[in-house]
A protein has these predicted regions:
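Beta-strand-loop-alpha-helix segment that lines the small-molecule cofactor/substrate pocket
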Residues: 1-4
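Flexible, glycine- and charge-enriched loops at secondary-structure boundaries
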Residues: 8-12, 92
Length: 270
C-alpha cells in the first residue's frame, strides 16, 4: 500500500473542509472562547529556525542553543529577521499566506471568538505575516521573552498557549497585565513524545495528573494559586533526579552551582 507522510499531503485539498467541520462540531459549546489555527507550525516551514538565530543560522533542531532559547533578548532583532526574510528564496507555500487562509475561513464560520495560534518561534512569526492575521499571539514556552515581545510588538494581544505546569510560568503571567493567561500542557499525562533513550517509558510525565488520574505536586501547587482554600502538599524526589546531593559532611548542596535557575522543569518536578 501507499505510505502516506501524513495530512500535509492532503492539506491543500481538505484544509478548509476540515477546519469548518471542526468548528461546526463545537462552536455552540460554551467552553469555546477562541479558535486556534495552528500549533507550533513554524517547525513545518523552512527558514523559521534560521531566521531566529537560535539554531546557529541553520534549520537543524540539533543546533539549537538552549542558553539563547532562555535569554530575555533573542539573538536576532526584528530588523535582522526582516532582512533575512527579504532575502530568503520564495517558497511554493508561505506560512503567512497559509495563516491568512485559515483565519479567513475561521471568521467565515464565527465572528464572536478570537483567532489565535500557538507560536514556538514568535520572533520569526511576527515578520512573516503569520501574526498579522491573528487577534491574539499565543506563545509556546516563552515567559523569558514576554517583555521583549511586548516592547517590539505593543499592539498585539498576547498570552501563553503552551506552558508547563510550574510556578515560574504562572508568575510570569500574573506579573504582567498584558499576558492574558496560560494554557497548561498538558493537564493529564499522555502517551507519546518519548524518545528511544527513554524506553520503556511511553508517556510524557508533565501533567498535574498522571495517566491514572492521581495528582502530582504541581496539581496542588496550581490549586493553591487558583483557590482561596489553604493547600498543603508534601512530595519527595529521588536522589537520582534531584538537582541536590549530600556532600562528604552530610550537607545538602547543589550538584551544579545555580543549576536551579537554568532548569526550572527539573527542580520543581515532584
Amino acid at each position: 500500500d501507499y505510505i502516506t507522510r501524513g495530512h500535509s499531503e492532503h492539506f491543500q485539498q481538505w484544509a478548509e473542509i476540515d477546519l469548518k467541520n471542526v468548528m461546526r462540531s463545537s462552536r455552540n459549546h460554551p467552553c469555546i472562547f477562541q479558535w486556534s489555527i495552528g500549533n507550533e507550525i513554524e517547525w513545518t516551514y523552512p527558514g523559521n529556525r534560521s531566521a531566529t538565530g537560535l539554531f546557529g543560522n541553520t534549520d537543524r533542531n540539533d543546533k539549537m542553543d538552549w542558553t539563547l532559547w532562555r535569554t530575555p533578548v533573542p539573538p536576532n532583532s526584528p530588523e535582522v529577521v526582516r532582512e533575512f526574510w527579504r532575502n530568503y528564496p520564495r517558497q511554493t507555500f508561505s506560512i503567512g499566506k497559509t495563516a491568512a487562509k485559515l483565519a479567513k475561513w475561521s471568521r467565515e464560520m464565527d465572528t464572536t471568538r478570537y483567532v489565535i495560534a500557538n507560536l514556538i518561534l514568535p520572533t520569526s512569526s511576527f515578520e512573516t505575516g503569520y501574526t498579522d492575521v491573528l487577534d491574539i499571539a499565543g506563545f509556546s514556552y516563552k515567559p523569558a521573552q514576554y517583555d521583549y515581545l511586548r516592547e517590539k510588538y505593543p499592539n498585539k494581544i498576547m498570552m501563553g498557549t503552551e506552558n508547563v505546569p510550574r510556578w515560574y510560568e504562572w508568575k510570569a503571567c500574573i506579573e504582567r497585565d498584558y499576558i492574558a493567561g496560560v494554557f497548561l500542557w498538558t493537564g493529564v499525562d499522555y502517551l507519546g513524545e518519548r524518545r528511544a533513550q527513554q524506553w520503556p517509558q511511553k508517556a510524557t510525565p508533565e501533567g498535574p495528573l498522571d495517566l491514572a488520574g492521581f495528582p502530582r505536586g504541581s496539581y496542588y501547587q496550581f490549586k493553591s494559586f487558583w483557590t482561596d482554600e489553604p493547600v498543603i502538599a508534601i512530595y519527595t524526589q529521588t536522589a537520582k533526579l534531584s538537582i541536590f546531593k549530600k556532600d562528604a559532611d552530610g550537607n545538602v548542596v547543589e550538584k551544579k552551582k545555580d543549576y536551579w535557575k537554568l532548569a526550572p522543569r527539573v527542580w520543581q518536578n515532584v
